[in-house]
């Protein structure tokens, strides 16, 4: 049986001399305690040495992926096929590939693993012609090269640095806000007017660090930090400040907090520049499309640039809005149109009605840029610049769609109404004051004429009745002299007679005119009786 043993120096093929001892797996390690004992079990048949580390790296990457290298294929065809013996391999996947392509019987078992372990322990004595120093140097170089290959390592392409940098940048922003708020509240007890005069946080902390107590503002020179007008205003406010007095220990603690704020803000600017440079080195096209901050947040959200490249455009569009997405799906409402990509400059400068369209188009182009940066060999940002120019042109067409110029026959079709200045004097309509519902019905001309005739007839009848009533009243007045009881009854009848024509007929003007005449006649009769 032959044994294929891979080393960092080259391929070694051993011949098993005593196969009976392989049956005792538990005691096989005793046979490899010394080089002499090991030479009695296995013997080197062929050794194929690598020329350099690059060749060794290519061979081992092929073995890791379960593939056969060209160099290994030549060795197996030359040595193993001629021997017509089974081949022991350390990897079952590699054995399957060898059997498929070269038609060689391969063995992989716990016995083979124990045999490989014994050969590895006595490798210096079993492989002559290779110095231990050379073996150690090749092992170290191959280990570094293999690690770089497996981790996709590159000095310029480390997306882990971007993930950590953007996370630290967000943490620094939160800490700075907390520290600045605490500093303003703390020093506000001593000099509250300063917070209203100086709005910039960093300038505020620098002024505190330079002056300290409120009494020192009169003699302090703040021309390096503030304009002349603001400096004069600060000094004037310090003289008439309504703040309380504080001790020197309080001022020392406030100043120490100010130094912390200044140092953190300076480190934040340095970290932001580092992030910009790292993004331009790793993902230049993504940086051009969405900016360094949004691009870094997308990479951090996905975990790495390779993971982000595996996402679809629709996923990248709503990346960062997972809570809103699942909430919308649960409540069966409209899903969100954008996530982290909303903070890109192209989406921000768009009108609200076009934000959804632009975010969808930007996500599609950003995915192309991500995949180009992740898998492309070229590190230029030409593709990103070209796609951004297309998106900006598309954005201009969307914004100017309603303001297009009319040319040709369109001018004749587009009729514009003439402008007329209406300066008519309007009167107040009191009919709108009533809250009662009014329903105005139009009447026909014939009906109006008939109604006029009826009213005229009623008026004539009313005049005749008034004359009759006057005559009857005269007779009744004469009868009133006999008895007072009869007079009262007659008076009741008079009232009854007066009310009947009013209830039956329409209101007329003649009755209203006749009533004062009746009263005069009654008075005359009463005077005559007396």
From Swiss-Prot:
Compositionally biased intervals (Basic residues): 486-496, 518-530
Cross-link (Glycyl lysine isopeptide (Lys-Gly) (interchain with G-Cter in SUMO)) at residue(s): 467, 498
Compositionally skewed regions (Acidic residues) per UniProt: 469-482
Superkingdom of this protein's organism: Eukaryota
Biased composition annotated in UniProt, kind: Basic and acidic residues: 414-427
GO biological process: ribosomal small subunit biogenesis
The keyword Lyase appears for this protein: no
Cited SUPFAM superfamilies: Nop domain
One Pfam family per UniProt: Nop
Alphabetized GO MF terms: snoRNA binding
Cross-link entry Glycyl lysine isopeptide (Lys-Gly) (interchain with G-Cter in SUMO2), positions: 157, 353, 411, 415, 422, 426, 441, 444, 465, 467, 486, 498
Assembly information from the UniProt record: Core component of box C/D small nucleolar ribonucleoprotein (snoRNP) particles; the core proteins SNU13, NOP56, NOP58 and FBL or FBLL1 assemble stepwise onto the snoRNA. Interacts with NOLC1/Nopp140. Interacts with NOPCHAP1, NUFIP1, RUVBL1 and RUVBL2; NOPCHAP1 bridges the association of NOP58 with RUVBL1:RUVBL2 and NUFIP1. Interacts with PIH1D1. Part of the small subunit (SSU) processome, composed of more than 70 proteins and the RNA chaperone small nucleolar RNA (snoRNA) U3.
Entry protein name: Nucleolar protein 58
The organism of origin for this protein: Macaca fascicularis
